[in-house]
Amino acid sequence: MHPPETTTKMASVRFMVTPTKIDDIPGLSDTSPDLSSRSSSRVRFSSRESVPETSRSEPMSEMSGATTSLATVALDPPSDRTSHPQDVIEDLSQNSITGEHSQLLDDGHKKARNAYLNNSNYEEGDEYFDKNLALFEEEMDTRPKVSSLLNRMANYTNLTQGAKEHEEAENITEGKKKPTKTPQMGTFMGVYLPCLQNIFGVILFLRLTWVVGTAGVLQAFAIVLICCCCTMLTAISMSAIATNGVVPAGGSYFMISRALGPEFGGAVGLCFYLGTTFAAAMYILGAIEIFLVYIVPRAAIFHSDDALKESAAMLNNMRVYGTAFLVLMVLVVFIGVRYVNKFASLFLACVIVSILAIYAGAIKSSFAPPHFPVCMLGNRTLSSRHIDVCSKTKEINNMTVPSKLWGFFCNSSQFFNATCDEYFVHNNVTSIQGIPGLASGIITENLWSNYLPKGEIIEKPSAKSSDVLGSLNHEYVLVDITTSFTLLVGIFFPSVTGIMAGSNRSGDLKDAQKSIPIGTILAILTTSFVYLSNVVLFGACIEGVVLRDKFGDAVKGNLVVGTLSWPSPWVIVIGSFFSTCGAGLQSLTGAPRLLQAIAKDNIIPFLRVFGHSKANGEPTWALLLTAAIAELGILIASLDLVAPILSMFFLMCYLFVNLACALQTLLRTPNWRPRFRYYHWALSFMGMSICLALMFISSWYYAIVAMVIAGMIYKYIEYQGAEKEWGDGIRGLSLSAARFALLRLEEGPPHTKNWRPQLLVLLKLDEDLHVKHPRLLTFASQLKAGKGLTIVGSVIVGNFLENYGEALAAEQTIKHLMEAEKVKGFCQLVVAAKLREGISHLIQSCGLGGMKHNTVVMGWPNGWRQSEDARAWKTFIGTVRVTTAAHLALLVAKNISFFPSNVEQFSEGNIDVWWIVHDGGMLMLLPFLLKQHKVWRKCSIRIFTVAQLEDNSIQMKKDLATFLYHLRIEAEVEVVEMHDSDISAYTYERTLMMEQRSQMLRHMRLSKTERDREAQLVKDRNSMLRLTSIGSDEDEETETYQEKVHMTWTKDKYMASRGQKAKSMEGFQDLLNMRPDQSNVRRMHTAVKLNEVIVNKSHEAKLVLLNMPGPPRNPEGDENYMEFLEVLTEGLERVLLVRGGGSEVITIYS
């Protein structure tokens, strides 16, 4: 047999065994179970899906005949050779081919051909492996099955600890973990009512009437509306942040710090802590004011007969009693915080009953107003605390005698001829109704403002009065503080704070992402309605002089809002006292825990001591610091002076919440996927502007102090964490900012929630330096929602000195294409002697500092089967191995020419994700990013995962739906059951054909090398420029062999070659005795089974994403690996094979 003839027959064998196209051999499909009747991929797969499992184990004479004919036509071997494989297949057809028939394998070659796995357990039995997922078994330790992880992923939520503690707890073995009680609180009990309790507070009962009387109904309505708009816009921003992942215990501080980073987070967290601490002081002062002024006035320790000094005595009383109250409350919190929580519902009931009493009283006043007369001297309001009758004289035993009022304004209380105050002499004493009622029309008088300086007498403008001034008497009702619009804003704003009570309880909520937005916004709407309606009701029911009487002196010392309530003023007094005490306890409970959370984050080193707690978890040191700061507020002693301080810190906090939402929305990071949809950066910016305006409106100097404190904290945290880099002039500002940002990014790998795809797109160039597959760039541009880095790279094979000009020309070509496809990024070309080395250099060295790629995008080598050169697929697998070694993600687009351009838009369709193994969550993130682009926007996401026989598919579906809910990704979920089934004869035959083809190609490459060596040498030496695209690299062994052959053809070499050809012929004869390697059979079984279910479910999908199995550890199985991937993806129009980089890229946390 002469060598040329042998070569010809070998070539015929290769094309006969693996036809490159179905049309090449009519009626013959290289993947169909019925090898004689399939003609198209669509028909082939639909038919295969319909073939019953039992039919594949029946005798298949057609298949065996086809196999025999293929071999016979190729080589015409002796009959004993041809009959052997047929007998084997017929024998196998009588028994389903499973792992139990391992005796059919050629034991002498089994281990050598087992390129994927060398495991002792394999020979003992197949139970060690999952038959249906054999393709993925090598990496099960790093990429576990989805079914084994779903339950744990779905139950990440509702944790009682913070994210940091949760990450630490994940390292504890399951046996050591304490069972956590599942939170059961819903929207009403968990968010709505706590928000109501925290928003309604002391200001409503003690100051709202005074605000209405001083500012007038219109301006008071504007104050309340502005404050409510501020909190509503903040709540919208907070809802977006809160629903952007699971918010463990830590609430608002956790949200802000994780959304804005440690510097802003620490600054805002401390502002929020100080606000909560001063809130405790304000509530305590409010409770003391109710206690000393309205409940037990005689309990006052300090007194003064001078009207101007009486307020100073009252402040001293507040300091003494406030300190005592603070110590008592701290002891209650220290000893038993659980009692505070138990009585919270009682305190809330007090608030609700008090508010209902106000509405009931307002309604009743329209037909039966309560009797609260107000004594007036001219148009001046008199205090009724010490007078017996509202007149200058009174009758006793038919005798007219001076009244007590006479004695207050005259130098003698016994005689009518005494010297009296001039104003008292010229004006009459009259009594007016303090609560005229809803139908009286008094609102017309109360519409306008009446701002007064401190010490002025409260007057009724519409009453008649002489122009005589008279002397100032302490029996008049005086203004105790200079009033203005800005002051009232600062005093009222604390009454709308407390909107974060729901997010603070996020760890106790059954579904925080649903409950927090609904509960918080409903609570704000409720409280806003109450406040706005009360402004109107107070102005319509109560006399103006009574409204401006802060402490109720004109109505016998009653609480002004209590005079309107029904059935008794005591309902409001007692209810407001207990609710204020309860709010103070809640603040003293929450503030230390907030400080503890900040201290545990360790962003402010000097606060580290406050992160410690006693045995039962109570933050003792933090409680003591909170009490000390609250004492500072109590020493101020005035509710009207503490409230603006409180406003500053809360406004600062709300400002940064709005800033966080606006920044996240504008930056559009991949992790920004709020389940709450009704937000916009403009709303957040408006909320931020209102917060800033309110800070300076209420008190510009307090605002500056608060901002300086926040700025100092920010700079301190930044100083502790990193050096500050300054620019060197205006011209270098951009460079300095970029350098500083790169140095900051260099500090470490990004947090999971900050991960975004930084793409390295590997392009193929043709001989004319044009991009072969521009759709690969189009696809990269459609992922630009990730807002990450894009580097477009390619390799020119040759010498850098000779090919530098071509590299520049190719770079310009690629840049023009990038502009056309609207890809914002960088282009980098490498000139290398070998393509694989060039690709490796690109993957290793592209990028700078933290701006390095984390994902490689490349196309599938479509012509690898047709190519006689192994370079077509060896470069591809080499690239896969390099990306895996570099811990980079890999995206392989198959049939890239079918991918849509940027001008095409799908009006409907599905993006199908087949989640087989978990390798970091790339499969979840990619379809979300694609849907941000107009091309894919109208497509729906469907996520499929595979259940085995031992899996609970119903529970898996629930867990997967829960997991996606927490990821804020809207997708249809389906669990596909793949029960263990016998390996079909078709799978066995497909594996056999694959291995025969590999063996024949190996022999043919050897023969072809010998035949063409002289011509190849001439070609290699004369080629000045070799531009080789990715997927067609030189094989290293071939090149080495060619470089060694420099001699001309000799007789000795001719004889040696004849011996090698003889061995080659023997190898071909052995092909007919081959029995497929069992590990390859099992992998082919996985590919076939998965392909069946994928094509059945996703044959009409616009895009299919699925896990890409890893390459074999033993390079001998590389070609089989390519075949497995081909089988896995056959019959699908657009496929994206995804291989994660080994780190998590998506998280449920905020």
UniProtKB/Swiss-Prot annotation:
InterPro entries, per the entry: AA-permease/SLC12A_dom (IPR004841), KCL_cotranspt (IPR000076), SLC12_C (IPR018491), SLC12A_fam (IPR004842)
Q: Which domain of life is it from?
A: Eukaryota
Q: So which tissues is this one expressed in?
A: Expressed in brain (at protein level). Highly expressed in heart, brain and kidney. Detected at lower levels in skeletal muscle, placenta, lung and pancreas. Detected in umbilical vein endothelial cells.
Q: Which residues bind chloride 2?
A: N151, I443, T444
Where in the sequence is Phosphothreonine found?
A: T778, T991, T1048
Positions with a binding annotation for chloride 1? L447, W448, I603
Residues annotated as binding K(+) = S147, S148, I443, T444, N446
How is this protein's activity controlled? Inhibited following phosphorylation by OXSR1/OSR1 and STK39/SPAK: phosphorylation takes place downstream of WNK kinases (WNK1, WNK2, WNK3 or WNK4) in response to hyperosmotic stress and subsequent cell shrinkage. Activated by N-ethylmaleimide (NEM). Inhibited by DIOA, bumetanide and furosemide.
Q: How does it sit in the membrane?
A: Multi-pass membrane protein
**Compositionally biased region (Low complexity):** 28-45
Map out region (Scissor helix) in residue numbers: 682-691
**Residue numbers spanned by region Interaction with CKB:** 1133-1150
* Effect on the protein of changing Q586A: Decrease in Cl(-) efflux
| Entry similarity comment | Belongs to the SLC12A transporter family. K/Cl co-transporter subfamily.
Stated name of the protein: Solute carrier family 12 member 6
